[in-house]
Regions:
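N-terminal Sec-pathway targeting helices
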Residues: 6-21
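Non-catalytic tandem-repeat scaffold regions and their flanking low-complexity/translocation tails
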Residues: 17, 29-366
């Protein structure tokens, strides 16, 4: 059974766990919206077009992301970060295609701003956490690309030093070092193994783990982004590359991997529960928790659907850990404990206590 002592302490991994939930929500959001909302009706698009004069000149197909990215890049250059986020938030509320690619579009706003300023601090001062902190990840991508592959090994440990000094182990510190993971994937041409080794140059285990999470997340995003490709995800081996990476990378890998496993299993949660049960013993619980995050993310944190998918676990250990992952995702999705409480109250008594305890502890971090 799941026990609370398996949750990492704040200093050892507090924001790593938060980041794992938050960053992977975006993977689930992309997949869930592509799976459930592949098109937008003509009538709805007409209404949206009136609300936003530039956003919907893009086609509603795989090319739409590239088109929207260019629009937000230009808009951010011309009007600044706050106005770009105002536009993005309005579009997010009414169109599934924007919801699908919201994190990527936030990356674009961050990259664009970072290209125009001198350093991380200046770019971060204008940031917005909307859509799972994509802005900050985009900033770091730009910063790393500016430094370049040749100079990066020497400079990598110092890039987030100022933020670390101001707010050590904070969410901002986490976003900085997690964003480095995105950035090193950029400069290594999405070489996952080389990128993980680059993360090992950081100063402590917490920063390294946060960076690993960025690498594995970028690998997942390479699979769903139309202008990228991952060489490290296999349809016939749904838990690859977690099965082959070195031991220190496995936790972060399995914390991301069920999003890919669900895609190749056509969202058969029962099948992926079984796949989780067959991996290395030390990582079975985190795999179940990853499925809980996906159960929430695939349903936009709908109580009944999330509960139903978690109850597909074959035993109490699988179901309990799924609920742990799900309730964290509810808190992250809503930035509130109200909806998470609704999930907990919907459960049998045997699951309510761990759900409520996890919810309360996790909500304190926000």
């Amino acid at each position: 059974m799941f026990t609370m002592n398996r949750i990492r302490s704040f200093k050892a991994g507090h924001w790593i766990i938060i980041g794992a939930v938050i960053i992977v929500i975006l993977i689930v959001a992309v997949v869930a919206n592509q799976y459930n909302d592949s098109t937008t009706s003509k009538s709805k698009r007409s209404v949206i077009s009136t609300a936003d004069s530039f956003q919907y000149k893009c086609k509603s197909d795989a090319e739409s992301l590239l088109c929207m990215e260019q629009q937000y890049k230009t808009f951010t250059k011309n009007h600044g970060v706050p106005t770009a986020f105002t536009k993005l938030k309005a579009a997010y509320a009414i169109d599934p295609s924007v919801k699908t690619y919201c994190h990527q579009l936030s990356h674009v706003i961050g990259r664009t701003e970072a290209d125009m300023v001198k350093n991380v601090d200046e770019a971060y001062s204008k940031g917005d956490n909307f859509c799972w902190s994509g802005y900050y990840h985009g900033v770091m991508e730009s910063i790393v690309v500016k430094i370049g592959a040749k100079n990066l090994p020497a400079k990598l440990p110092t890039i987030c030093a100022a933020i670390k000094a101001q707010k050590p182990y904070s969410f901002y510190h986490y976003n900085c070092v997690h964003g480095l993971g995105h950035g090193v994937m950029d400069v290594t041409d999405s070489n996952l193994f080389a990128s993980l080794k680059m993360c090992d140059l950081l100063s402590n285990a917490w920063e390294k783990e946060s960076c690993y999470g960025g690498v594995f997340m970028e690998n997942e995003m390479d699979e769903v982004n139309p202008d990228h490709h991952s060489n490290y995800l296999k349809a016939d081996q749904p838990m690859y590359p977690c099965t082959v990476v070195e031991q220190q990378y496995k936790y972060q890998c399995y914390l991301m991997q069920t999003s890919h496993a669900l895609r190749v299993a056509n969202y058969d949660f029962a099948k992926v529960f079984t796949e989780c049960s067959n991996i290395e013993t030390n990582y079975i619980e985190v795999c179940y928790q990853s499925l809980g995050r996906d159960a929430s993310g695939n349903s936009s944190s709908n109580v009944d659907k999330t509960k139903a998918n978690c109850m597909l676990g074959a035993n109490s250990d699988a179901q309990t850990n799924c609920i742990v992952g799900a309730v964290k995702d509810f808190v992250s999705y809503y930035h509130s404990d109200k909806q998470a409480n609704d999930l907990c109250l919907s459960l049998d008594n045997s699951l309510q206590q761990i759900c409520q305890t996890t919810k309360a502890q996790y909500y304190k971090t926000f």
